[in-house]
A protein has these predicted regions:
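Carboxylate-rich, polar loop motifs that coordinate divalent cations or form catalytic acidic clusters
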Residues: 1-194
Length: 194
C-alpha cells in the first residue's frame, strides 16, 4: 500500500503541476493593430477560419495575421454580423442592413438591402442587434421589428411592444416580446409559446 501511495503521488503531482501551468493562448489586438474604432460589437467566423467583427466604423476581417477594414457607403457602424460563407456576410447597424459578397479579386463588396424595404424611414431610428441565418431566410432583428430577407424580398414582423434579443436555441429561434410573452420564430411566423 505504501508503494502504491508513493507511486501515485510521484505520478500525480508532476501531472497536476504541468496542467496547472497551462494557460490559454490569448492575444489581445489593440486598435492600433487593426486600425479601426476601439468598440467591436459582434463576431462571426467563416468555414476557412476567417473572423469578421462589427465595429463602430465598419466591418473588420482578419485571418489571424492581417486585418482589413470594410466600410459601408454611409460609414455606418456595424453592430451585427452573420456569416453565411466565406463568400457572403450579412451586417446590420444604425439604420442600415446589407450583405457583403466577394468579387473576383477576393475583396468584399457591400450591397445595401434597405431598398427592398417598403418603409425605409422607419429604419432611421433603429439599430440592428442580431442577425441569424436559417436556410434561405436571414433574420435581421431590431428592438422594434424582425426583418426577414429571403434573397429577393424583405418582410417585417412586429409585436405591439417590440422585441428583446432573438436567440437560437437547439436549432430553434426564440424571441421575447418586450415586457411580454415568449415566441418561437418558425418558417418566418411568430408562434406564442404555450
Amino acid at each position: 500500500l505504501k508503494y502504491f501511495i508513493k507511486s501515485f503521488l510521484l505520478f500525480f503531482i508532476p501531472i497536476t503541476t504541468l496542467l496547472a501551468n497551462q494557460k490559454p493562448y490569448i492575444v489581445n489586438f489593440t486598435r492600433d493593430r487593426y486600425h479601426a474604432a476601439n468598440k467591436n460589437w459582434s463576431i462571426g467566423e467563416d468555414e476557412k477560419g476567417v473572423m469578421y467583427f462589427g465595429n463602430d466604423i465598419g466591418m473588420l476581417e482578419s485571418d489571424g495575421m492581417e486585418w482589413k477594414l470594410y466600410t459601408t457607403p454611409y460609414s455606418t457602424l456595424i453592430r451585427a454580423v452573420a456569416v453565411e460563407s466565406h463568400q457572403t456576410i450579412y451586417t446590420g447597424g444604425s439604420g442600415e442592413l446589407g450583405r457583403w459578397d466577394r468579387d473576383n479579386t477576393g475583396r468584399l463588396v457591400y450591397t445595401s438591402l434597405t431598398s427592398l424595404l417598403h418603409d425605409k424611414q422607419s429604419l432611421d431610428s433603429q439599430s440592428f442587434w442580431r442577425i441569424w441565418i436559417d436556410g434561405n431566410n436571414v433574420y435581421f432583428q431590431t428592438f422594434s421589428h424582425i426583418y426577414i430577407y429571403d434573397h429577393r424580398t424583405i418582410r417585417k414582423l412586429s409585436l405591439p411592444n417590440g422585441f428583446l434579443l432573438l436567440q437560437k436555441v437547439r436549432n430553434e429561434f426564440w424571441v421575447q416580446e418586450m415586457f411580454g410573452s415568449l415566441y418561437q420564430l418558425k418558417n418566418g411566423i411568430l408562434h406564442k409559446a404555450q
